[in-house]
């Protein structure tokens, strides 16, 4: 049996249509689950996900300050936690500690129950906010997985076990790509470019998101305007515009403007526009604790807002990034994945992640409804997001950052 495991995290986040996922059909209303709704297990892991998200962001930002950044910390963490079920020793400890968990303070069972609850919550049908996540376990036809690992990834992470002929790398590549393409309604195609011939197992995770603004922009008000990438570079972008009441505050601690824009449903986009020359300060200073204070402050102010249409993506080989967070052994010959299979020693050869973000005017689908907003009779201040800014998409039920990114140049896909 080949002695290599190729692990792919293939993830998608996009403001595009997708129907509700299948996990919600498995979540049954029991007395215990009703009781847990007040203090769900996902809330216990939320602070750790937030810390992991910002740590991962800082590593990516340190690699380059001239490129867009966009990723889903929830999806990456979910895939790593799922993989940890089959690891032992230092390999096991590194993964969970890299996710900001301290096993002396939180039982491992609570960690996995937290992710189980997180996935059930995110995949619950919602007529306003469309969000789903999927996990696929592609297994070499001749590889015998341990029953406990297979049972745990199915019950806790709702992973599909899919027999795969990895001896035919092209056939296996097409099978994985078809799974991702179907799960993302055609948004991502040909994501896996090549597979190593020694691959025996691939973990594939995707997340898909479509949000509708509570208060959409009018397409007729969108005009081409300048966006200042840096002091030497200016690009023309479609700039959306809306006069109205916004959750907008200036934070002296972050030296940034903080704008919250709600989606219909249970999610909010937080945009952080640093004062000129203060991007590095913002990146070094921002914490989820600070952002949580703004999420609780729902005061509004009258603003004439200008915001660029955005269509960006982030594609990452996570191996180097995770090394910076102390997750190294799983990628080495010393990796202990003996909880996955006893057939052969395994190591993770590849960890891929892709996320896509689209921001546009459409807050709702066309419908016979009218929205009237009352605004004071005064000259409002302008607020232009015409230079690089950060974005965090936050889900309220799970208290988790679904996506984190930086828009440096809205015209670069």
From Swiss-Prot:
<dbReference type="GO" id="GO:0004867">
    <property type="term" value="F:serine-type endopeptidase inhibitor activity"/>
</dbReference>
<feature type="glycosylation site" description="N-linked (GlcNAc...) asparagine">
    <location>
        <position position="266"/>
    </location>
</feature>
<comment type="function">
    <text>Protease inhibitor.</text>
</comment>
<keyword id="KW-0964">Secreted</keyword>
<keyword id="KW-0646">Protease inhibitor</keyword>
<dbReference type="InterPro" id="IPR023795">
    <property type="entry name" value="Serpin_CS"/>
</dbReference>
<feature type="site" description="Reactive bond">
    <location>
        <begin position="377"/>
        <end position="378"/>
    </location>
</feature>
<dbReference type="Pfam" id="PF00079">
    <property type="entry name" value="Serpin"/>
</dbReference>
<feature type="modified residue" description="Pyrrolidone carboxylic acid">
    <location>
        <position position="25"/>
    </location>
</feature>
<dbReference type="InterPro" id="IPR042178">
    <property type="entry name" value="Serpin_sf_1"/>
</dbReference>
<dbReference type="InterPro" id="IPR000215">
    <property type="entry name" value="Serpin_fam"/>
</dbReference>
<feature type="glycosylation site" description="N-linked (GlcNAc...) asparagine">
    <location>
        <position position="165"/>
    </location>
</feature>
<dbReference type="InterPro" id="IPR042185">
    <property type="entry name" value="Serpin_sf_2"/>
</dbReference>
<keyword id="KW-0873">Pyrrolidone carboxylic acid</keyword>
<dbReference type="GO" id="GO:0005615">
    <property type="term" value="C:extracellular space"/>
</dbReference>
<keyword id="KW-0732">Signal</keyword>
<keyword id="KW-0325">Glycoprotein</keyword>
<comment type="similarity">
    <text>Belongs to the serpin family.</text>
</comment>
<protein>
    <recommendedName>
        <fullName>Alpha-1-antitrypsin-like protein CM55-MM</fullName>
    </recommendedName>
</protein>
<dbReference type="InterPro" id="IPR023796">
    <property type="entry name" value="Serpin_dom"/>
</dbReference>
<feature type="glycosylation site" description="N-linked (GlcNAc...) asparagine">
    <location>
        <position position="65"/>
    </location>
</feature>
<keyword id="KW-0722">Serine protease inhibitor</keyword>
<feature type="signal peptide">
    <location>
        <begin position="1"/>
        <end position="24"/>
    </location>
</feature>
<feature type="region of interest" description="RCL">
    <location>
        <begin position="368"/>
        <end position="387"/>
    </location>
</feature>
<dbReference type="InterPro" id="IPR036186">
    <property type="entry name" value="Serpin_sf"/>
</dbReference>
<feature type="glycosylation site" description="N-linked (GlcNAc...) asparagine">
    <location>
        <position position="102"/>
    </location>
</feature>
């Amino acid at each position: 049996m080949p002695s290599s495991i190729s692990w792919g995290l293939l993830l998608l986040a996009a403001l595009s249509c997708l129907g509700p996922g299948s996990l919600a059909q498995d979540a049954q209303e029991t007395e215990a689950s009703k009781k847990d709704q007040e203090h769900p297990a996902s809330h216990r892991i939320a602070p750790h996900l937030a810390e992991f998200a910002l740590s991962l962001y800082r590593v990516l930002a340190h690699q380059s300050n001239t490129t867009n950044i966009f990723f889903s910390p929830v999806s990456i963490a979910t895939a790593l936690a799922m993989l940890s079920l089959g690891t032992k020793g230092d390999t096991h400890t590194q993964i969970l500690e890299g996710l900001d968990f301290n096993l002396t303070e939180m039982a491992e069972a609570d960690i996995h129950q937290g992710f189980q609850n997180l996935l059930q919550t995110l995949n619950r049908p919602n007529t306003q906010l469309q969000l789903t996540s999927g996990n696929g376990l592609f297994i070499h036809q001749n590889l015998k997985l341990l029953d406990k690992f297979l049972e745990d990834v199915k019950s806790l992470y709702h992973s599909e076990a899919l027999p795969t002929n990895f001896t035919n790398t092209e056939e296996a590549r097409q099978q994985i790509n078809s799974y991702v393409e179907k799960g993302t309604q055609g948004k991502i195609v040909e994501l896996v470019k090549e597979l190593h011939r020694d691959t025996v197992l691939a973990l594939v995770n995707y997340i898909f998101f479509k949000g509708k603004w509570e208060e959409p922009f009018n397409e007729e008000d969108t005009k081409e305007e300048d966006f200042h990438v840096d002091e030497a570079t200016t690009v023309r972008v479609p700039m959306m515009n809306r006069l109205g009441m916004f959750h907008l505050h200036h934070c002296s601690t972050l030296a940034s403007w903080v704008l919250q824009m709600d989606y219909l449903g249970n999610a909010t986009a937080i945009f952080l526009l640093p004062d000129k020359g203060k991007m590095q300060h913002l990146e070094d200073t921002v914490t989820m604790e600070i952002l949580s204070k703004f999420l609780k402050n729902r005061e509004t102010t009258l603003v004439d807002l200008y915001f660029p249409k955005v269509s960006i993506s982030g594609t990452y080989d996570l191996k180097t990034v995770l090394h910076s967070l102390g997750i190294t052994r799983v990628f080495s010959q010393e990796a202990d994945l003996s909880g996955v299979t006893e057939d052969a020693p395994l190591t993770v050869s590849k960890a891929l992640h892709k996320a896509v973000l689209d921001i546009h005017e459409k807050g709702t689908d066309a419908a016979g409804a009218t929205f009237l907003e009352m605004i004071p009779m005064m000259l409002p201040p302008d607020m232009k997001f015409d230079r690089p800014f950060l974005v965090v998409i936050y889900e309220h039920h799970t208290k988790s950052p679904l996506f984190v990114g930086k828009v440096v140049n809205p015209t670069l896909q």
